[in-house]
Structure formats: C-alpha cells, structure tokens
Amino acid sequence: MGINLAADSRVFIIEGISGSGKDTFQTYLKEQLEGPHLYDYSEGEVLHSWKHLQIEGILKLRIKFMKLFVNYVSDIVSRDENAVFLLNRFHLSAYVSTIIQQPKLKREYDDIINVLRTLPIHVFILQLDENEIEERSLHPERSSAWQKHQQQIVNKEGFRDRLERYLWQQGLMLEAAERQQIPYSVIKFPCALENGTRIASWT
C-alpha cells in the first residue's frame, strides 16, 4: 500500500482509536518530514491525552484551545512557506470525545472545521479490523490508572465492553471525516509501513 502525498500538504493530522498505532505512525512521519520548520505535537500537547479527561471543564477548554490553535497554524503556514505541522489527534478525536458528549459546543467546533478546510491539510485515519481491536487496545505497558480509567469510561458511556466502544468510535470518525470533506486517507496500520508507505519530500 503506497501513499504519495502532494507536496503542498503541510498540515498532517493522525487520527484513530486507542491502539491503532498513532504514536508509531507519528514517529515514522516525523522521520520523513524532519527539518527545522517541522512543528510536531503529541496528543497531550493538543489537550487530547486521557489524563485530561477527568478534569472538570476540560471539554469546553479543549474546544477553546483548538480554536486558538488552528488560527495559530493558519498564521504560521501563511508566513512560512516551509512550515509543516504534524499533530497526533485533533478534530476527529474531538468530535468523538467532546462534541458527542456536549453538543452545545458544536458551533465553536464548526468554526475549527471551517479553518481546517482552508489549510493545505491531509488527515491519516488509522483503522483496525474488529479482531485486532481487542488485542491492540489492551496496552499492557500502560499504568493501572489508565486501565481503570478505560473501564470507567466504558461503564459511564453505557457500552457493553471496550470493543463495542472502540468500534463505535472508529465508525464515527469515518462518518465525520466523509461529512467534513477535509482530505484524508484510511490506513490499515501497521500493514501500511510494512508495504512501503511513502510521503513526498519538501524542498
């Protein structure tokens, strides 16, 4: 599976459910795009870490931050023709985790989407087959606090188990991506790297 992006794509967003390989794919893309004008952001740096979710008011704060952030990205990209942004989670994760939970934030969210549509952007949606989700989403290397948090979320949101929740999230992300009409690719990861994914280079 080869992917060759046009050189005018300068904002890259990696999306996908927990366990889909976002961190690994971000590391790979960072190696391909490495340079003095690369702005690289982890999920925590864009307020999408699981550690934020139990903070009261975080969903509203996240949307406010995202509005400021997209304007910042737009400004940098317009002023520096060599600037490239690489984000781990952003608008699709926000839709699944924030807008579905608090629909009253949708107007501000739509403002974010409108700015994203004006940018030279490409979104990678990492997708897992149903039989991969259970194994890859376990994250045995993560702390007991993370494991406990995941179970609390499953119970709070009324899902039968983690698999049901992640299948729902994955489908919702794809629906939102199609509706929002922001350029995107669906990638079966890690198979994509094994089969030679390639990113166009910049000069």
For every predicted segment, state its role.
Residues 23:
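Walker A/P-loop
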